[in-house]
C-alpha cells in the first residue's frame, strides 16, 4: 500500500502546476494559494500517510487494526483536492476502498486525480470517483453498503447525514462549519497580528471552515489594530484568480455570493459599522470586497452565523476571562487563534477554549501529522496524525484472551 501512496504523492508534486490551475479555474481561489498551499499540502498528506501503511500495528498498542471496509467520502468545494487527500490518504493507508464524491461545482481536480491514480497503477476499484449534486450525495449516504462515511461541509447538511445514519452500524466523521475567534492581547506584536488576521479571514475569500471570522481585541490596542487592518485591506487586490498578483479571487457561486451579501446587509441593519476598501471589482463573475465590521455585538448575526466569505467582525474585551467567554459564545468549536507574548497565557487560554485547534501567534497553519477537528456543531472525529487513522480501522484484541 505504501508503494502506491508514495507514487500518488510524487505524481501530485510533479503535476502540481496542472492541479493548481485547475483548482483556481474551478473554485475561483487565487492561483498563488492553489500553487503554494493547496497542492503541496495535498501531496504532503499522501507522503505522510504512506509512512503509516506498514506501521499500523504500532499505532494502536495492544490492538490489532483491520480495515474498516468500504469508505464513502463527501468533500466540499472550498478545498477540493486537499480535502480529497485528507480522506483518501488515511483510508488507503489503512487498507480500505473508497467512493469519493466531490462537490458539484468543483469536480475537475477529483477527475484529474483519477488519472493520477491510474498513472500510479492503483488497482481498479480501490478508489471510485462519483460526480453529481445533492441527490448523488444522498444516494451514497443511504446506499447501505458503506462501513464508514466521512463528510466535510456545512453544519446543516452534516446534521441531516447524522440523522439519516442514526441507528446504523456505520462509522461517521463530520467536519463542519466554524466561527473561529482570533484573540489579540495588548502585548502582542501588532504588525505580525495584522498579517495573521488577514490570512485568517481573507485567505481563499473566507471560504474556510476554520477562518478567523471573529476578531477579539483587547481594548487598549483595539483602535490601533483596526486602523492597521483598514490600511492593510486597502492593499488587497481582488480580481482574476489566475493572476499571480491577485489576493482575493472569485466567490464560488451565485448562491454563496447571495448568502454573503445577505449577512453583510443584516450586520448593517443591526447597527454594526461596515468598512470596505475602495477597490475595483471585475465587471463579470462573483466577487465581493474584503469587509470589516466594527461596533459588533455578540448577538449580531454576523458574530454568530458562519458567513463563509471575506467578512471580519471585530469585538473587544478587557480580561482573558472575558475573551474566553466571548470566544466560546458560539454554536461552533472548530478553531481559534491567540496572539500574546506570554506562554502561560497561551496555555491557559487553550485549556479554557472549546476549539479543536488553537493556534498561537499564527493562524491557518496545517501539518499532516497534526489532528484537525472540532467540537459542538463543528462536528466530531479527527483528520490527520495518528488520531486521524482511527476512523478508518476496526480494532481487535492483539492475541487470544
Range-by-range predicted roles:
Residues 156-297, 360:
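ALDH superfamily catalytic-core signature
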Residues 2-9, 20, 43, 110, ...:
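Hydrophobic face of alpha-helices
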Residues 1-56:
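Glycine-rich loop-to-alpha-helix module at the N-terminal edge of alpha/beta enzyme cores
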Residues 55-192, 317:
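Rossmann-like NAD(P) dinucleotide-binding subdomain of oxidoreductase/dehydrogenase enzymes
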Residues 1, 23, 46, 95, ...:
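Residue-level signal for inorganic ion chemistry
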Residues 16, 31, 190, 222, ...:
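Residues at or immediately preceding the N-termini of alpha-helices
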Residues 122, 146, 183, 237, ...:
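Conserved C-terminal structural/oligomerization subdomain of aldehyde/semialdehyde dehydrogenase
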Residues 10-17, 28, 32, 51, ...:
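Generic secondary-structure signature for well-ordered alpha-helical cores
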Amino acid at each position: 500500500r505504501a508503494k502506491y501512496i508514495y507514487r500518488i504523492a510524487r505524481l501530485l508534486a510533479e503535476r502540481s502546476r496542472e492541479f493548481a490551475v485547475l483548482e483556481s479555474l474551478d473554485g475561483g481561489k487565487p492561483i498563488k494559494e492553489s500553487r503554494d498551499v493547496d497542492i503541496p499540502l495535498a501531496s504532503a498528506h499522501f507522503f505522510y500517510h504512506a509512512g503509516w501503511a506498514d506501521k499500523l500495528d504500532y499505532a494502536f498498542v495492544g490492538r490489532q487494526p483491520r480495515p474498516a471496509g468500504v469508505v464513502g467520502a463527501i468533500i466540499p468545494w472550498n478545498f477540493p483536492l486537499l480535502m480529497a487527500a485528507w480522506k483518501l490518504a488515511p483510508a488507503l493507508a489503512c487498507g480500505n476502498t473508497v467512493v469519493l464524491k466531490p462537490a458539484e461545482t468543483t469536480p475537475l481536480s477529483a477527475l484529474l486525480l483519477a488519472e493520477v491514480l491510474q498513472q500510479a497503477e492503483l488497482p481498479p476499484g480501490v478508489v471510485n470517483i462519483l460526480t453529481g449534486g445533492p441527490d448523488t450525495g444522498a444516494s451514497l449516504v443511504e446506499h447501505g453498503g458503506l462501513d464508514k462515511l466521512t463528510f466535510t461541509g456545512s453544519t446543516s447538511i452534516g446534521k441531516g447525514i447524522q440523522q439519516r445514519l442514526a441507528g446504523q452500524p456505520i462509522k461517521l466523521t463530520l467536519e463542519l462549519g466554524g466561527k473561529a475567534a482570533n484573540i489579540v492581547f495588548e502585548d502582542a506584536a501588532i504588525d505580525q497580528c495584522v498579517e495573521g488576521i488577514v490570512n485568517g479571514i481573507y485567505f481563499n475569500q473566507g471560504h474556510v471552515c476554520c477562518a478567523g471570522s471573529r476578531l477579539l481585541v483587547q481594548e487598549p490596542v483595539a483602535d490601533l489594530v483596526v486602523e492597521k487592518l483598514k490600511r492593510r485591506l486597502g492593499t488587497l487586490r481582488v480580481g482574476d484568480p489566475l493572476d499571480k498578483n491577485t489576493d482575493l479571487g472569485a466567490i464560488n457561486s451565485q448562491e454563496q455570493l447571495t448568502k454573503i451579501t445577505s449577512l453583510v446587509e443584516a450586520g448593517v441593519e443591526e447597527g454594526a459599522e461596515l468598512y470596505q476598501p475602495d477597490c475595483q471589482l471585475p465587471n463579470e463573475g462573483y466577487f465581493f470586497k474584503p469587509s470589516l465590521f466594527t461596533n459588533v455585538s455578540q448577538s449580531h448575526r454576523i458574530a454568530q452565523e458562519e458567513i463563509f466569505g471575506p467578512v471580519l467582525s471585530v469585538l473587544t474585551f478587557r480580561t482573558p476571562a472575558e475573551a474566553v467567554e466571548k470566544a466560546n459564545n458560539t454554536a461552533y468549536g472548530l478553531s481559534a487563534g491567540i496572539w500574546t507574548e506570554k506562554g502561560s497565557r497561551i496555555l491557559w487560554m487553550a485549556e479554557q477554549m472549546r476549539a479543536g485547534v488553537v493556534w498561537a501567534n499564527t493562524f491557518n497553519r496545517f501539518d499532516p501529522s497534526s489532528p484537525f477537528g472540532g467540537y459542538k456543531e463543528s462536528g466530531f472525529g479527527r483528520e490527520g496524525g495518528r488520531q486521524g487513522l482511527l476512523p478508518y480501522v476496526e480494532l481487535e484484541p492483539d492475541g487470544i484472551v
